[in-house]
Structures are given as structure tokens and as C-alpha cells.
A protein has these predicted regions:
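N-terminal signal peptide c-region/cleavage motif recognized by signal peptidases
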Residues: 18-21
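Extracytosolic ligand-binding ectodomains
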Residues: 2-12, 24-378
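Expand to "…catalyze enediolate/carbanion chemistry for C-C bond making/breaking, isomerization
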Residues: 15
Length: 378
């Protein structure tokens, strides 16, 4: 007759086997994240990662099933440093790791070369890279999850002409794919709106001294300066504008300036003198926006930055398409995404054949008390 200890041991072993069998029934779907997790734009990369992570945690808690098996999402996050060469290495690394979906890159200059690798591997890439070239490669599984430079740059120019009554503008870009693209679109719309573009100066994404180019634009008596670049350069530029007597000249920019980091780095030099245009509607005015902000802050102990909500939404859209197509195969899921739409916390998502959003709101912000404040949404 078996002892009580033997019976307990057999029961424990049986429970362990059942547990392993349950795990074996899981389908693991690896989601890659590519973004700048080090360097000046690490704040943006981490914010984007947090948006994906929050979505994945919520999806795993729901235990979604595909083909009768529970789907378990795993995140593989890599630092592409905001550098095109590093981004290509990250793309190959994520491909080799068996990733099926990639959220990122953040930078257009990284997204453009990386998209070829992801496409060749049949991986869906969802990026906030706004340069129009990102979706011009003819890759069916590339999705731009926000407005493009065409919309962002032109919206800022139109606002400057109509609302700010600007007459003469200067333009500066940092020579990155993003900076050049958004500056070109701003200049095009500025001229179409009757503004005089008095000069176009250049800097780099690592520069800290802008005195020479700001002085050149000051001599041309500009009412505003549009900067195609990132917050780590935009903030010191705002400070130096004040130091050079340009305190009444507006500093305008694209989505990369619409971050609390801009005010954090620029201090009191960043206020209502700085305006930026960002793809997406006003989050706090969306039906589920405040609830998302609350969950994000509870989880990460900080407020969401520019694109956390967009990455959260796209992750949820991918899951919806998986469920609708009853597949985890990116080639099948991609078709389902092109043929459907998703209502997210920051807007509605539907894509054209090239992977651009069919409709995307653009919101113009300024800064008050160290935080971005929405002025208008189009």
C-alpha cells in the first residue's frame, strides 16, 4: 500500500506535467522593439517601448487564443541608438531571433534602411518615422502609424501663417532624414501660404552651438524659425535665441519638439514662444485617452510622452488582426490590417496600400508650465 508521502509525490509530479503541458499549448509571438534606448533621444525610445509593453501586458492577461492555442507575447527590445548602421544590425538581430512584428524604429533615418531587412524576412514593421520615403519602398508590411512629414510640416506652416500671422521665416534642419524631410515640407507649405522663407541653415543632430546660424537668420529679420530636428538640439536652440535677442521670434518644429523633454532641457526659455505640430489627436480629449494616461502613469511612474499611445494602439491593432484572421503569420495578419480598421486611444487606424494612415489628425502644441499644451487639432 503506497504511503501518504508517495501519493503526495505522485500528485505533485502529475500537477507539474499538467503545468508543462499547458505551457506547451501556448503560442509564443515575439514582438521586437527598435528605438534609441541610449543617447540624447533615449527618453523617446523608452517611452515608445513602454507603450508596447503596456499593451503586451494587457494582452497576455487576457490570454487571447488563436487556432485553439493561447497566444503569449514576448518582447525583445533593442537599442538602435537612433543610428542607421546600428539600426540595420538590430534589424538583423531581431530577424535572427524569430521576431514576427517590430514596433519601431523611432527615427526615419533608421527606419528607411531597416525596412528592407524586415520586408525580406516577412516581418511587419510599424514605425513613427515621418519622412515620406519610409513608405515609398514598395514594402507591403511597413506601416507608418502617425502622420507623415507632408502633414506635420504643412500643418505647422499653415498655423504659422493663419494664426500667428507670421510673414518671414527662417528654416534650420539637422541633416537627418527626419529633419530634412519635415523642413522641406514646412518650406513648401510656407511658400504656398504666402510666407517669405528668408534663409535655410544647417546643423547636425549632435550640435550644441547654434549662434552663427541664428545670427544669420536674425540679420534677415525673421518672425519665426522652423527647426527640423530633435528636442536635445531644439532646447538649447531656444535658449540661445533668447541670449541673442530673438525672444520675440517663435521657434517652430515638428513632433520631435512636442515632448516634455523640450521644456526640461530648455527651462524657462521654452514656453509659448515654442510651437510644434504632432501627428495624432489630443489624447486627453479622446474617449479612452484619460484612462490610458492613468494606466501608463501607474505602471511606469511618469506621464506618457509623444508616441507611447500610438505604439500601444498599433500593438493592439496587430492583436485584433491576428484574432480576426485566426493567424499569427505576419503575411496573413498584414492583409487583415490593410482590410480593416482599429479605434485606438489616440485615434482611428486604417492604412492605404503603401502603409500610410488614410486619415491622421495633426495637433499644434505650445508649452506652459513645462508641459506641452494643445492649441488646435486638424
Amino acid at each position: 500500500m503506497p504511503s501518504n508521502q508517495t501519493i503526495i509525490s505522485i500528485a505533485a509530479a502529475t500537477l507539474l506535467l499538467v503545468s508543462h503541458a499547458a505551457v506547451a499549448q501556448d503560442q509564443v509571438v515575439k514582438i521586437g522593439i527598435s528605438g534609441p534606448l541610449s543617447g540624447a533621444n533615449a527618453f523617446a525610445g523608452k517611452d515608445n517601448e513602454n507603450g508596447v509593453r503596456l499593451a503586451v501586458e494587457e494582452l497576455n492577461a487576457k490570454k487571447m487564443t488563436i487556432g485553439g492555442k493561447t497566444v503569449r507575447f514576448e518582447i525583445l527590445s533593442e537599442d538602435d541608438q537612433g543610428d542607421p548602421k546600428a539600426g540595420v544590425i538590430v534589424a538583423q538581430k531581431l530577424t535572427d531571433a524569430g521576431v514576427r512584428f517590430v514596433l519601431g524604429p523611432y527615427n526615419s533615418g533608421v527606419a528607411i534602411p531597416a525596412s528592407r531587412i524586415y520586408n525580406d524576412a516577412g516581418i511587419i514593421m510599424s514605425t513613427v518615422g515621418t519622412n515620406p520615403k519610409v513608405t515609398q519602398g514598395g514594402y507591403k508590411n511597413v506601416f507608418r502609424i502617425v502622420a507623415s512629414d507632408n502633414q506635420v510640416g504643412s500643418s505647422m506652416a499653415a498655423y504659422a501663417a493663419r494664426q500667428l500671422k507670421v510673414k518671414t521665416v527662417g528654416v534650420i534642419d539637422d541633416r537627418t532624414a527626419f529633419g530634412q524631410g519635415v523642413a522641406a515640407e514646412f518650406s513648401k507649405q510656407a511658400k504656398a501660404s504666402g510666407l517669405k522663407v528668408a534663409g535655410h541653415e544647417f546643423t547636425s543632430e549632435k550640435a550644441t552651438d547654434f549662434a552663427a546660424i541664428l545670427t544669420a537668420l536674425k540679420a534677415k529679420k525673421v518672425d519665426a524659425i522652423f527647426f527640423g530636428g530633435y528636442a536635445p538640439q531644439g532646447a538649447p536652440m531656444a535658449r540661445q535665441m533668447r541670449q541673442l535677442g530673438l525672444k520675440d521670434v517663435k521657434l517652430l518644429g515638428g513632433d520631435t519638439l512636442c515632448s516634455p523633454e523640450m521644456a526640461k532641457l530648455g527651462g524657462d526659455a521654452v514656453g509659448e514662444n515654442v510651437l510644434c505640430a504632432q501627428g495624432g489627436a489630443i489624447l486627453e480629449k479622446q474617449a479612452n485617452g484619460p484612462a490610458f494616461q492613468k494606466r501608463y502613469k501607474e505602471r511606469f511612474k511618469r506621464a506618457p510622452d509623444v508616441y507611447a499611445a500610438s505604439f500601444y494602439d498599433q500593438t493592439m491593432f496587430i492583436a485584433q488582426a491576428m484574432k480576426a484572421s485566426n493567424s499569427i503569420d505576419p503575411s496573413v495578419v498584414g492583409i487583415a490590417m490593410h482590410n480593416s480598421s482599429y479605434k485606438g486611444v489616440v485615434g482611428a487606424y486604417a492604412y492605404d496600400a503603401a502603409g500610410n494612415m488614410k486619415q491622421s489628425a495633426v495637433t499644434v502644441y505650445t508649452f506652459k508650465n513645462g508641459a506641452p499644451v494643445a492649441l488646435a487639432s486638424y
